[in-house]
UniProtKB/Swiss-Prot annotation:
Keywords: Amino-acid biosynthesis, ATP-binding, Cytoplasm, Glycosyltransferase, Histidine biosynthesis, Nucleotide-binding, Transferase. It catalyses: 1-(5-phospho-beta-D-ribosyl)-ATP + diphosphate = 5-phospho-alpha-D-ribose 1-diphosphate + ATP. The keyword Cell inner membrane does not apply. It is found in: Cytoplasm. Pathway: Amino-acid biosynthesis; L-histidine biosynthesis; L-histidine from 5-phospho-alpha-D-ribose 1-diphosphate: step 1/9. This is ATP phosphoribosyltransferase. PANTHER family: ATP PHOSPHORIBOSYLTRANSFERASE, ATP PHOSPHORIBOSYLTRANSFERASE ATP-PRTASE.
Length: 218
C-alpha cells in the first residue's frame, strides 16, 4: 500500500486559513488541532495526512522529506533560507506585514538620519539585518522568540521588527509602526524530491490550492 502524502501545518491562523484550501481539494481534517493532543491527524482522504508542527519548523520538515509539502509564512521561509524547497504558490492567506516599531515619542527618522546605532529586538534576525544594511542603518540585533513589544518598554531595545496585522498590540503597548519592511503571506512549499517522485499524487492538491488561492474555489 502506498504511504499517504504528508502535509505540514502549524496551529493557529495558518491552519484555520488552510482548511478552506483543503476543502477545495475535497478534503477535511478529521480532528481540530486546538482540541486534539495528536500531532498526526488523518483526513477524509486516505492518501493525505496532516502533521502539526511549530511554524518555524515547517520548512525543515519539508526540506528533509518528513513532510511532502507544507504551508509556511514568507517570514519563516526568509529566515530558513529556502534550501531544498520548491515554492510554487503564494496562497494569499495569513496576510500581514513585517514592520519596524518604536515607542511613541521616539524620533526614529532623526535617529537614523543622525547615524545613531540602534538596538533592535526581533526573531527575524536575517531579514532585519538585510533590511537595515540596505538602508545603511547601524543596528545591534537582539534575538527574541516572543513578546517582542516588551523589549522597548523595559529598555532592552530601541525598536522592534515584528509582524503587524491590525496594529492593536502595538497600540496597547504604546508603540508605533514607523516603517514597513515587506508584506507577508503564507506560501505552499514542496519537497523537491517529492515533487519528482510523487508528482501524480501531489498534483491534484497543488492544482486545487492554486485555484482556491486565486479565488477560483473548487
Amino acid at each position: 500500500m502506498t504511504a499517504p502524502l504528508t502535509l505540514a501545518l502549524s496551529k493557529g491562523r495558518i491552519f484555520e486559513e488552510t482548511v478552506p484550501l483543503l476543502a477545495a481539494a475535497g478534503v477535511t481534517v478529521a480532528e481540530d488541532p486546538e482540541r486534539s493532543r495528536k500531532l498526526i491527524l488523518p483526513t477524509t482522504d486516505p492518501n493525505l495526512r496532516v502533521i502539526v508542527v511549530r511554524a518555524t519548523d515547517v520548512p525543515t520538515y519539508v526540506e528533509y522529506g518528513a513532510a511532502d509539502f507544507g504551508v509556511a509564512g514568507k517570514d519563516v521561509l526568509l529566515e530558513h533560507g529556502g534550501g531544498g524547497l520548491y515554492q510554487p504558490i503564494d496562497l494569499n492567506i495569513a496576510r500581514c506585514r513585517m514592520s519596524v516599531a518604536v515607542p511613541a515619542g521616539f524620533d526614529y527618522a532623526n535617529a537614523v538620519r543622525q547615524g545613531a546605532r540602534l538596538r533592535v529586538a526581533t526573531k527575524y534576525v536575517e531579514t532585519a539585518r538585510e533590511h537595515f544594511a540596505a538602508k545603511g542603518v547601524h543596528v545591534d540585533l537582539i534575538k527574541l522568540y516572543g513578546s517582542m513589544e516588551l523589549a522597548p518598554l523595559v529598555g532592552l531595545a530601541d525598536a522592534i521588527v515584528d509582524l503587524v496585522s491590525s496594529g492593536g498590540t502595538l497600540k496597547a503597548n504604546n508603540l508605533v509602526e514607523v516603517e514597513e519592511i515587506m508584506p507577508i503571506s503564507s506560501r505552499l512549499v514542496v519537497n523537491q524530491a517529492a515533487l519528482k517522485l510523487k508528482r501524480a499524487a501531489l498534483k491534484p492538491f497543488l492544482d486545487a490550492f492554486e485555484r482556491a488561492s486565486q479565488g477560483g474555489g473548487a
